[in-house]
Amino acid sequence: MGDPERPEAAGLDQDERSSSDTNENEIKSNEEPLLRKSSRRFVIFPIQYPDIWKMYKQAQASFWTAEEVDLSKDLPHWNKLKADEKYFISHILAFFAASDGIVNENLVERFSQEVQVPEARCFYGFQILIENVHSEMYSLLIDTYIRDPKKREFLFNAIETMPYVKKKADWALRWIADRKSTFGERVVAFAAVEGVFFSGSFAAIFWLKKRGLMPGLTFSNELISRDEGLHCDFACLMFQYLVNKPSEERVREIIVDAVKIEQEFLTEALPVGLIGMNCILMKQYIEFVADRLLVELGFSKVFQAENPFDFMENISLEGKTNFFEKRVSEYQRFAVMAETTDNVFTLDADF
């Protein structure tokens, strides 16, 4: 992927062009406060980026584990689902189970090594932790619903067994491997992974909640979509701090590319019609989500799409940490977001 060949590089061979692109990116990295190497990266205090630190504390406050999701009521619902509904849900879970591992690959291989600001490194470290929880949760859901070992194995190997999952995975993996692209381009690409590639699937599971189905699955979906909304907001915050941002044209190109892949995934490869949703409205919803992401990145809308799903009005991807502040199901770690003075222990109380 990366930028088209520059005219001034037309006479260079491929290795020379690659070296030229890499050197140019290194120069640009040195101009970025977020990426500039410093011994300060080993020490958290004093906080230099309070808004980045606040997002880290939000992530910390919303930590949860797979064991806290009750799946005991899901199996009776699962057994009553139509074959098409089971097919759709199991394949969506297979996509999710693989995707969180890819997000973590990027965080470990690229972002955590490139970013030098300790507040952001704290966030990425916690994101890696919660992405592991997400992956475990999706694997546990597959393990609970799918009793046939061969079907289970097929789903756990979705990147190899399902071409449409592989297509989405390959798109993300190419960005991890791309040494020519700038940090800003890759921030946008992974905001698209978490903000666009996940959005339609989240909406499909919320649709099941609207129908009163699968309480364990839908509760875990609330928690995970809240987390991913925060991760997407964090990517947009990091983007705002960049000195050398990609052009609006380049950002649009990346996000529109992701939109096309996601629309194909949920309206052709794994159509939401299988669970009774409208494919045309799903296409519109994905465009709406993409427009919202573009606005949060500081650019104008491409699609001018309205939200066609009323039941998606209040979830995390709707806007800046809305869902977090709503505290889904009152689920937030006690005192993590409280002011320090709220939790001071004193010995002068009357007993």
UniProtKB/Swiss-Prot annotation:
Binding site residues for Fe cation 2: 131, 194, 228, 231
InterPro entries hit by this protein: Ferritin-like_SF, RNR-like, RNR_small, RNR_small_AS, RNR_small_fam
GO MF terms, alphabetically ordered: identical protein binding; metal ion binding; ribonucleoside-diphosphate reductase activity, thioredoxin disulfide as acceptor
Required cofactor(s): Fe cation
A UniProt-annotated Pfam family: Ribonuc_red_sm
Role played: Plays a pivotal role in cell survival by repairing damaged DNA in a p53/TP53-dependent manner. Supplies deoxyribonucleotides for DNA repair in cells arrested at G1 or G2. Contains an iron-tyrosyl free radical center required for catalysis. Forms an active ribonucleotide reductase (RNR) complex with RRM1 which is expressed both in resting and proliferating cells in response to DNA damage.
Protein name in UniProt: Ribonucleoside-diphosphate reductase subunit M2 B
Gene for this chain: RRM2B
